[in-house]
Amino acid sequence: MKINVYTLNSFAKTKEGGNPAGVVMNADSLSEEEMRKIAAVLGFSETAFVLQSNKADVKVRFFTPDEEVDLCGHATIAAFYAMSSLNLLKQGKYEQETRAGILGIEIHNDNFVMMDQSMPVFSEVIDKDEIADSLNISTSQITSDLLVQVVSTGLRDIMVPVRSMEMLDAIRPDMKKVKEISRKYNAVGYHVFSLESLHGANAYCRNFAPSYGIPEESATGTSSGALGCYLYHYGKINEEQASHIIFEQGYSMKKPSEIRVSLAIRENRIIEVKVGGKAMNLTAAEVEI
């Protein structure tokens, strides 16, 4: 069985950068097992399958090589960038149906895609010693004035602040322990960050999600939304900065990526979360399953 697919790099800062994703259009006739097989053959951290929806403009399902996930930021960017580039969608506002709910999408004039996230949920605060041990670092390398905490804007991630970019680049995690702790807290993985950056961004990040078959990811949309909310919540980003937050990721993998986050604030409360970016290298291909 041959399937037409598109591949592209979401959140790319350069042509080498970004997070690769697969996109399959008109996927209504595919079974869940066929979708999983296609995702496994492509081998990207996520592949998006675009289907018809009776609740929104489109329905999108997301598969890692191992399983289906509720939502994926970079594969959403990939899917809507591809639909826009192929003239299937024009500039404007759309709704996508996902397992995480119905979420708004905006396509801007340069195929720049912004997507709505759920309102932030701040959950468990985690012992720093436990996290440091799993990352093979000392507890003193974790920022003292910020918490290690599970935060979600659609998917639960563990926010881990470290003191410097240099320390962050040097981290070599114990993936078995990261996997165990992620599962213990029902989180996708760790979003580890430093408030230092290379090019004036608000933070420099690395993301580890071995429990989903992703040892490290070069650009993570949903975690970026959660991080933007976390930094505002703990006073590291003010209301003026909140509408234009930039995160760097993927540099340690030689895949430079830039993720934008926009928070709308009213009376010191977050009332809207958007995450977005560009994609590059749209290519048509065929896979056999």
Each model region followed by its residue ranges:
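Active-site proximal loop and beta-alpha junction motif in alpha/beta enzyme cores
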Residues: 1-71, 77-289
